[in-house]
């Protein structure tokens, strides 16, 4: 539905108000946002720091982090490709992660634990779909507007813990950290802890 609405309502402010109302069931307050979700919409419209585009592109974000704190904090890259047909599947190790550079969430992320049973055709189809997704058009997240859709493969990190690897997210309001969210069991039974 977002893709269709994008072309009907080209103005970012009107579009975000409409989508917010449809998803949240209430009016979006942009003049004095109080709720976290309202503040996020305000940021989409008024905080246009060009550095954000580097941060949402998974490939350029890795380069940025490496330049700031060092390569040892970066998951090693196995390959980068512009299209699915260019992926050199035979050169990838038995375990790896492959994902698109232009998306958020997990729609374009695939964790391979055993390449011998990987359905390359299915993963390729899903990667192609993810490469065509446009978060800027769907949600007006402007940092994604100029991200070149690519595919990146990385080493697969594993944990000895029963819950697997943990993903920490720090949420800030007005520049201050307010919440820490820990995601775990993302491969089997997704759980969050606030």
Identify the residue ranges that each predicted region occupies.
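Intrinsically disordered, low-complexity segments enriched in polar/charged residues with Gly/Pro
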Residues: 15, 84, 98, 156-158
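A conserved helix-loop-beta module that forms one wall/lid of the active-site cleft
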Residues: 32-115, 120-142, 148-150
């Amino acid at each position: 539905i977002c893709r269709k609405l994008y072309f009907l309502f080209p103005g970012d402010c009107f579009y975000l108000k409409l989508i917010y109302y449809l998803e949240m069931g209430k009016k979006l307050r942009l003049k004095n946002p109080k709720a976290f979700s309202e503040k996020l919409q305000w940021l989409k419209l008024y905080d246009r720091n060009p550095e954000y585009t580097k941060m949402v592109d998974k490939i350029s974000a890795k380069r940025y982090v490496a330049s700031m704190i060092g390569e040892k904090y970066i998951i090693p890259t196995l390959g980068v490709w512009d299209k699915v047909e260019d992926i050199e599947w035979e050169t990838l190790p038995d375990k790896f992660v492959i994902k698109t550079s232009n998306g958020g969430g997990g729609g374009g992320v695939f964790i391979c634990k055993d390449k011998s049973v990987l359905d390359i055709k299915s993963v390729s189809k899903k990667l192609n779909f993810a490469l065509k997704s446009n978060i800027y058009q769907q949600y007006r997240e402007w940092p994604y507007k100029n991200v070149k859709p690519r595919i990146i493969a990385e080493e697969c990190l594993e944990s000895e813990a029963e819950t697997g690897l943990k993903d920490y997210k720090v949420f800030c309001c007005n520049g201050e950290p307010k919440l820490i969210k820990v995601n775990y069991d993302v491969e089997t039974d997704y759980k969050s802890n606030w």
